[in-house]
UniProtKB/Swiss-Prot annotation:
It comes from Escherichia coli (strain K12). Pfam families: DUF535. This is Uncharacterized protein YbjX. GO terms for biological process: DNA damage response. To H.influenzae HI_0461.
Length: 330
């Protein structure tokens, strides 16, 4: 059960005094009220906000970029379900204070991307879908069965651990609920087109035995978990009438920014190689443009002894689309 955030009291005539006017962040009130409630620690949507140093940095960095900060706080203060959203995305108010999505995007671009992302999700999801997305570990996109009856799920969710790389994540779980692959993105308007902008791609966490990946790959007829989340991302993009899919490269990942130079070693995936393996092409901005649909080998081109396995792979991939066909309004 999601806990609601504390009620906040703000005096609009004298900000140093508390009055009888109370509200929760989900109500549409002033951006200044939301800002002060966060800076003062009256609203603490996550563990980060319990640290005075975190709140002080939020205050100082907001003052350094006053115009964007006011615009962002004003945007957030009018969002429905903000109190619930902040329990899932507690660092949402500080998105503009650190590198996000891609190393070469401006803060203004990031603000517009965040605004677009959540507006599009609210527009395209039914009330039930949006509620499940906000209030549960994951909105199920598809359920898949392995060669020996193993159960896997593809889910749309939000992950604090990936929040620098995007605000939504599609993950692939095994029957024990262990995520084996994650692809993180933000929906935005980029270069005049509705875009799925992918900022992160990860396999299983380091503590998960590699045998789990091997078992899942074998059960899925040789399909790697990352390939399955990529397929789901393409189908999700189609459902939302996305016009292009852009992905960060090894060179434009957020860990290439000056702030995160000490974390470059945390990029374990070879983004460029993976995007190229699914037909991606590097553009002038050093991002990869990915196909709306991943090309498949023709059965006739495959060695006869492998054709049966490829047919089973394609059957598994084809099982995703019908399950998503009735979801979202596009």
């Amino acid at each position: 059960m999601v806990k609601s955030t504390p009620c906040i009291t703000i005096d609009f005539m004298n900000m140093s005094q508390l009055t009888e006017r109370t509200f929760t962040p989900s109500e549409s009130l002033s951006s200044l009220s939301l800002f002060l409630s966060l800076a003062r620690g009256q609203c603490r949507p996550g563990k980060f906000w319990h640290r005075r140093s975190f709140r002080q940095k939020f205050l100082l960095r907001s003052l350094i970029m006053p115009r964007l900060s006011v615009e962002w706080m004003n945007e957030l203060s009018h969002w429905p379900n903000l109190n619930v959203l902040l329990t899932r995305q507690p660092r949402l108010p500080v998105r503009l204070h650190r590198p996000y999505l891609a190393a070469n995007l401006s803060r203004k671009q990031l603000l517009e991307a965040l605004r677009y992302h959540y507006a599009l999700l609210r527009e395209c999801m039914s009330a039930e879908e949006f509620s499940l997305y906000l209030n549960t570990p994951g909105l199920q996109l598809a359920k898949l069965e392995g060669k020996n009856g193993e159960q896997f799920t593809l889910e749309l969710t939000m992950m604090i651990s990936m929040d620098k790389e995007g605000d939504s994540t599609i993950l692939f779980r095994n029957s024990e609920g262990i995520p084996l692959a994650e692809i993180t993105f933000t929906l935005c308007e980029y270069q005049g087109k509705r875009t799925m902008f992918i900022g992160g791609l990860q396999g299983a966490k380091w503590e998960i035995p590699h045998q789990e990946i091997q078992n899942a790959t074998k059960a899925c007829h040789g399909l790697f978990p990352k390939r399955l989340v990529m397929e789901a991302a393409c189908l999700f993009a189609q459902r939302l009438q996305v016009e292009q899919i852009i992905a960060v490269s090894n060179e434009t990942h957020i860990y290439r920014s000056l702030r995160y130079r000490d974390k470059e070693g945390k990029i374990h995936a070879d983004y460029n190689a993976f995007w190229e393996s699914v037909g991606g092409v590097c553009d002038a901005e050093r991002h990869y443009r990915l196909p709306a649909q991943i090309a498949r080998k023709e059965i006739a081109e495959i060695a006869s002894k492998k054709r049966a396995e490829y047919r089973r792979r394609y059957e598994m991939l084809d099982a995703i689309q019908p399950q998503m066909a009735t979801m979202f309004r596009g």
